[in-house]
Amino acid sequence: MAEIRPFVSIRPQRGKAAEIAALPYDVYNREEATKEVERHPQSFLSIDRAETQFPLSVDMYDDKVYERAHDTLWQWVENGTFLTEDKKCYYLYELTMNGRVQTGVAACASIDDYENGIIKKHENTRAEKEVDRIRHVDVCNAQTGPIFLAYRANEGIRRIVEKTKQGEPEYDFTSEDGVRHRVFVIREDADIAAIHEAFAGVDSIYIADGHHRAASAVKVGQKRRKEHPGYTGEEEFNYFLSVLFPDDELMIMDYNRVIRDLNGYSFKGLYREVEKRFDVEEITGAEDTRPKERGTFCMYMEEHWFSCHIRQEDRTPEDPVADLDVSILQNKLLEPVLGIRDPKTDGRIDFVGGIRGMDELVRRCEQDCAVAFAMYPTSIAELFAVADAGLLMPPKSTWFEPKLRSGLFIHEI
């Protein structure tokens, strides 16, 4: 029984949504974020990454950075850049990339559902990243970046979504990366009640992207509960900003690996080790170098591409984590042969999102790496199976596109 609520959104005036909407805060390093804000002063990164308002000599975690985020947010509310909705609503957030459409419900999810396992996680979080967002949410008194949630497709929700999308969108713009964004407001009481009831029948919701934002929102909620011992559960700090998508509309892209050296092996030596563990064939001519099916990955080394097939005896369907292609590559090759024991901390491995294409793997091998591995994308069903088992995905297993924009919905707590 998921508790997914409408909320009073703070959001851009209709004509300002395109210039305000920004990629998630953690997509950029400090230099990139600063350049983006210089190009687009109204970008929501001015709030999400308020260190962009200070010289590099100022620590990005200084108290005054969070205070600037608070001040900028509420100045934009006061000067009319943002409006405050006059009632609790749900919103539809539709993203179209390369002809693929996915439509989510923007709403607030319950921190109790997060803590009792109705909202399921599949990633560990890092304390230092949590602390940053905890302070940002707490000082701003608002959640500014939605958590990307997924649920098993539900016909009742789909009907309301399709009906709503027949009306006029509140926002309709195309971002610089070619993604079209449309937002619809669900204001009718009957539709609001129907969505609330439909989600109440959903027994599991999954964090697709935004584990640190979710953990931070929950911890701020817990802190506020301690500060308000008479809390009722109705206060806004008991809920966190989310956009919920049906699983059958989501696209996970490949998340590829590049290794800086061959750990002492020659080209032929490493090839022999790979051949012992996988069924290998060279890719010749103009063949596509992307893996074509689960159980296959492609390797690039010294201007040669190879297709590598996982053997059936290495499959472990009873263990949803060990059975992932990325786990088998890690456990059969990256650790025992290339010496990558902990991919989270080993500086010899890097990860390349599939949105960058196979050419980026070749470029990295020409520039600063020795071998690249192109993976077949993890499926949403595999992610659900891992989360349902209460397990964690290996690092850098999933790359979701398109990314949700921050700044289109703000939840005051």
Indicate residue ranges for each PLM-predicted region.
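Surface-exposed, charge/polar-rich loops and edge strands
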Residues: 1-413
